[in-house]
Amino acid sequence: MSNLTLDVHTADGSTNGTVDLPSSVFDVEVSTPLLHQVVTAQLAARRQGTHATKTRGQVRGGGRKPYRQKGTGRARQGSIRAPQFTGGGTVHGPQPRDYDQRTPKKMKAAALRGALSDRARHDRIHVVEDLVPGQTPSTKAARTFIGRLTDRKSVLVVLGREDVNSIKSARNLPNVHILPSDQLNTYDVLNSDDLVFSVEALNAFIERATGAETKEESK
């Protein structure tokens, strides 16, 4: 498989060279079950898991027998905090728990490659030199530039951590999500319609992704 070549767009509307997307990262077979498993694990890990209900032993009150055992014609009861009473404890209710699912690193990496490949095949990856011209942050300029690249609703912008100018320019835009290249993940790729990479962030991601593949092959 040959590498995919994309133009590098500039903020003034022109292009400045091209970049190659390695086929080993951006042109692989997509496994829907793998994507589902990895995304499910990601969303599960975000859950706090602090939900809790009180059992009959934790509800306040109910220490005294509500009425005598015999002679009333009613069913015997030992506490007004038993589960069948209003205000009583909960039976088998949710308790605090950890929702984390163990997902091997190779599965996460394979899912991310599959998600990126899907976006690349549908021309939904764009590469920019800088998000805004000059050294002054401008939300208006960032909105205009992204609007020229894509008219889709949700956009994921991948930037370098040191690119403070671009981060400040795009962070308040609605439906635009910003990530550093080292935090790129399957869920955010699939949750966005289009991806916009800065050249710096794209090169850093490719270097890390292809370097990890080389290490795996050498084992």
UniProtKB/Swiss-Prot annotation:
Keyword Ribosomal protein carried by entry: yes
InterPro entries found in the cross-reference section: Ribosomal_uL4, Ribosomal_uL4-like, Ribosomal_uL4_dom_sf
The keyword Hydrolase is annotated on this UniProt entry: no
One Pfam entry name: Ribosomal_L4
One of the GO BP terms on file: translation
Cystine bridges: none
Molecular-function GO terms, alphabetical: rRNA binding; structural constituent of ribosome
Matching Gene3D superfamilies: 3.40.1370.10
Basic residues bias: start-end ranges: 62-73
Residue ranges, annotated region (Disordered): 45-103
Listed GO CC annotations: ribonucleoprotein complex; ribosome
Alphabetic keyword roster: Ribonucleoprotein, Ribosomal protein, RNA-binding, rRNA-binding
Functional note: One of the primary rRNA binding proteins, this protein initially binds near the 5'-end of the 23S rRNA. It is important during the early stages of 50S assembly. It makes multiple contacts with different domains of the 23S rRNA in the assembled 50S subunit and ribosome. Forms part of the polypeptide exit tunnel.
Subunit structure and binding partners: Part of the 50S ribosomal subunit.
Similarity comment text for this entry: Belongs to the universal ribosomal protein uL4 family.
Protein name stated in the entry: Large ribosomal subunit protein uL4
Species of the source: Corynebacterium kroppenstedtii (strain DSM 44385 / JCM 11950 / CIP 105744 / CCUG 35717)
Name of the coding gene: rplD
